[in-house]
Amino acid sequence: EIMPSLVGSEMCIRDRKKRRLNMNTGFIKVSAVSPRVTVANVEKNLQNALKTVKAESESGSSLIVFPELYLTAYTCGDLFLQDALIQSALDALIKFSKETAYSDAVICIGLPLRVSSRLYNCAAVLQSGAILGIVPKTYIPNYNEYYEKRWFASSEKVNCSSVIIDDEEVPFGSNLLFTLSSGAVLGVEICEDLWVPVPPSSELCLNGADIIANLSASNEAVTKNDYRKNIISVQSAKCFCAYVYASSGVGESSTDLVFSGACTIAENGAILSESERFAFDGSSASAFIDFEKLNSERVRNGSFSDNNEILRENDFTVIPAYVNEAEYDNVKRSFYPYPFVPSNESERELRCGEILSIQSAGLAKRLAHTGLKKAVIGISGGLDSTLALLVAVKAMEMLSLPNENIICVTMPGFGTTDMTYNNAVELIKALNTTFKEIDIKPACLRHMSDIGHDSDIHDITYENTQARERTQILMDISNKVGGILVGTGDLSELALGWCTYNADHMSMYGVNCSVPKTLVRHLVRFEAEKLGGEIEQILLRVLATPVSPELLPPDENGNIKQKTEDKLGPYEVHDFYLYYFLRFGTKPQKLLFMASRAFSGKYSEEQLKEWLRLFIKRFFISQFKRSCLPDGPKVGSVSLSPRGDFRMPSDAEFTEWLKF
């Protein structure tokens, strides 16, 4: 029998030399494993566990999680009341610890342990030949097919804080946390603990854990797998944590139940990896956890901190168990290149419909509030103004107002091409909106003459003269007809400062202000497919048009010469940077690594590095434009509204962000 330590509540934790981390990448490789298990054959299970640790350690795993009661098997029944089985499990744990001393990985393995005349269902946490701690199960199921209270006591019955195993004092309790790195902390719970309304993992996370290991023995039943994955996913989302779940496999007794060896790894609501089920030779799942992203989520979510302050307990014991973070080259994790756009087609369609509803409802509310019944939009034949027009049409429908109440103004300038002009005119007429055309060239020439600027010098003054002339016209028409000037600029342009201050930067309500360029395309395409016919053909031509402000004259063939992406780089790359930079505060070196994976084979690392530098510089120097943005609706998790989502001084330096 394991006796409680005489130390009582005072924890004597052995001195452990803190390992020097090889790299501050923010990634840790974790594995949930369910090797072949044999009921009551401890030696065979031990050997399988040793083989598994060797394989996982060689693959670079820093955390290896076995199933519940793995050393004995979960389905031993009343054999748990036999001294021979309990002693064999303890002996196996000691041997397992010594024979895995070569591994720096933190290992969680399940076994029954008797302490002070009570039997506990436990998870042992080991590293480098040392047993770091023993965590007993808290919630002991005793319903339906479960009869665990027949054998096991809850951690609530524990009356000691450490035990002696192999002449070493080992922390014992459900209040243990294990530091894996400078930013990652491990907490442990067992099977049923997850299925209660307030799992121990919630408390563990509030006290600092951001990776949860669950050693489980979850039998299969129809629909149970989906439900199980759902609660794993939801718990990881609620707690902003990674969840590493390993369940017993088909080697368990099939007298009444069948176990599948389900292994699942989730991170902040997303399933990163899951194993094959019902594999006779065992199963496993591995993933690279981005704990820096989890920490960022917690820092940004005020309610998590509030919950922490209200419910946090102060009697948790933190045990050092430092592991190496994965080097970037070894991180086997892919990154979807379009984080603003769902990869699944059906989900993408639902998202597009919802975003358009948010945009149009925002505009409709503003019109209703002001009592104005008309909307004024400058239509260029490009993507952004096209989307704004489609939103305005839906807003009018909400308000039961005719499309004629949308005043569409096309304002040809020095860079306007026949292609964009025709797209604009045809779309305005096809949607039955009110068409108005004003040639801005005479006014711009007069203005440049007034300020003494040579109109043959095509510099920033030449370009911005046109942009501000257009905005002045639109503002005045709005006053004249009693309407709202609808802004067309998108989130990507705001991030890069690709707008003229007090020109297209300004409006009375900006419907696209939190829609990035990559998403604008999908929204327009979604509406094209929905509307069909002539309108669809016009919208498809708009989608095929290069992105351009058209402020410089066309080439000799009348085609667009000034192409935005030739100057800035691809919007798909900038949107990728924008999402992770704002959403998670991702550091530039890591951002470059992620982009290299996301756009592998499409852009070189040198190109991505050049565009990242450009993104950072333009993002910082353009904050003054974002500090005075018009109102506009937030549609997703990333927004640059100075009133809500993003507050930054306009004169901040970007030097620290260029150190990569």
Feature-to-residue mapping (PLM):
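ATP/NTP-dependent adenylation/nucleotidyl-transfer catalytic domains that generate, transfer
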Residues: 29, 45, 182, 240-241, ...
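Helix N-cap / beta->alpha transition motif
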Residues: 4, 288-290, 439
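Enzyme catalytic cores with a strong preference for nitrogen-chemistry domains
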Residues: 18-378, 394-403, 435
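Active-site micro-motifs of SAM-dependent methyltransferase domains
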Residues: 13, 71, 196, 442-445, ...
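Single conserved hydrophobic/aromatic residue that forms the stacking wall/gate
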Residues: 1-15
